[in-house]
Amino acid sequence: MVRLAAELLLLLGLLLLTLHITVLRSSPLQHGNDTVSLEQDSRVAENNVNADSSSSVQLGPGDRQTRVAHIPASQPWAQSPGTGGSLQRDGPGAFLLDLQNFPDLSKADINGQNPNIQVTIEVVDSLEGSEPEKGMRKENKPGWAAPNWRNWWQRSSSSSSSSVSTPKGPEEQDYPYESNTEDSNFLKPLGDWERRVKSEAGAGSRTQTEYDYIDGEGDWSAWSPCSVSCGNGNQKRTRSCGYACTATESRTCDMPSCPGIEDAFKTAATEVSLLAGTEEFNATELFGVDTDSCERWMNCKSEFLKKYMSKVATDLPSCPCFYPTEVAYSTADVHDANTKRNFRWKDASGPKEKLEIYKPTARYCIRSMLTLESTTLAAQHCCYDDSMKLITRGKGAGTPNLISTEFSADLHYKVDILPWIICKGDWSRYNHARPPNNGQKCAENPQDEDYYKQFEEAREF
């Protein structure tokens, strides 16, 4: 009997102890402690969000940014999509009830010390710009080859293009890409797809000038019109040779003779015919080149020849001491100090001149051109060595042409070339009758030793 009473008392004590433990678990003190713990956790999470916000990239007005953060589920707070950016705290009871509505969290064990739960929170300033920014978030660093890198540059650059139209508000700014010279970077010209993107983006804007920079040398342009309408002139053409570089090429152009030039030479031609005693100018009879004797040609002292040679000496310019390089590209004016006039010269070094035969030591030659002021049909002929110095004597020296090639190439051959052939290339006898010009008193070229050597060779030949 006593034993039965003891067992009953022990069972009653266990029931009281169980009841006491149940009452303690459901007491308000426990809820208060949980609330304090949750508030402390929420403050820590809020500080973390502020730290992340301060370290994020600052964007201008109208820009959107998506923030992604991972936090433990023991921090009972969340950002509502409709709110501007302030954090909302819920009571612990409401949080526990709402937690059951999430399929992924309904079976989570929240009684553990560190529950393995991750919550994704998106901080969105505006719903308008969420889609474009998702495309930018796919890359960790800017890719310069991506089609939309220019849009990113336009937003991040502090200096925007002047072609952007009326400024918009922060929420309606769409940043269309337009540009002037910044668009055509010579280091990376626009590709075809970039041109299409630009034309679509700026369909409603004004037309922009596109510059195509050529890497290296481009195609030559068409030749420009001749600089003169009659006579001898020049024309040019250009091409691009890179950034801020233009190559220019020029050439001579021969137009029909200017009106009046035939009249200017008519008197001289008539005088030649009259003095020769024939109706036509016969060079072979005048200079006696129809014979095989070089002496007869050298001793021809007709009155016409004396008068003509006197006019040639005063009418023609003196040879420049150095080859005028501008003549190599086109005709050029060179000032003559003796006559105090400008004379027009052209190059005479081409293959048809046959310098290796008639002027064997010459590298360059020039010939004066006829003008309306000319009183004869003659032209000055000057030749230069490899160092562009005037050859004043010897077998390479130039001699005056009594008939210019401009007037008649056939007469020039009969009067100026054929006598040299009749003399069998003996330049010493030819130059005696047609002395080379050195009116500007240039230094003797070649030197005495070379000159005498050439003279002896001519005599022996």
From Swiss-Prot:
Keywords: Disulfide bond, Glycoprotein, Secreted, Signal. Glycans are attached at residues 33, 282. Residues 286-449 form the AMOP domain. Disulfide bonds join 226-253, 230-258, 241-245. One of its GO terms (biological process) is embryonic hemopoiesis. This is Isthmin-1. Gene3D superfamilies: Thrombospondin type-1 (TSP1) repeat (2.20.100.10). Belongs to the isthmin family. It comes from Danio rerio (Zebrafish). Residues 1-26 form the signal peptide. Residues 131-141 have a biased composition (Basic and acidic residues). May specifically influence certain angiogenesis process. Residues 215-259 form the TSP type-1 domain. Induction: Up-regulated by Wnt signaling. GO terms for cellular component: extracellular region. Residues 156-165 have a biased composition (Low complexity). It is found in: Secreted. Pfam families: AMOP, TSP_1. The gene is ism1. Disruption phenotype: Morpholino knockdown of the protein causes disorganized intersegmental vessels in the trunk. Residues 40-58 have a biased composition (Polar residues). Residues 40-62, 73-92, 128-188 are annotated as: Disordered. SMART domains: AMOP, TSP1.
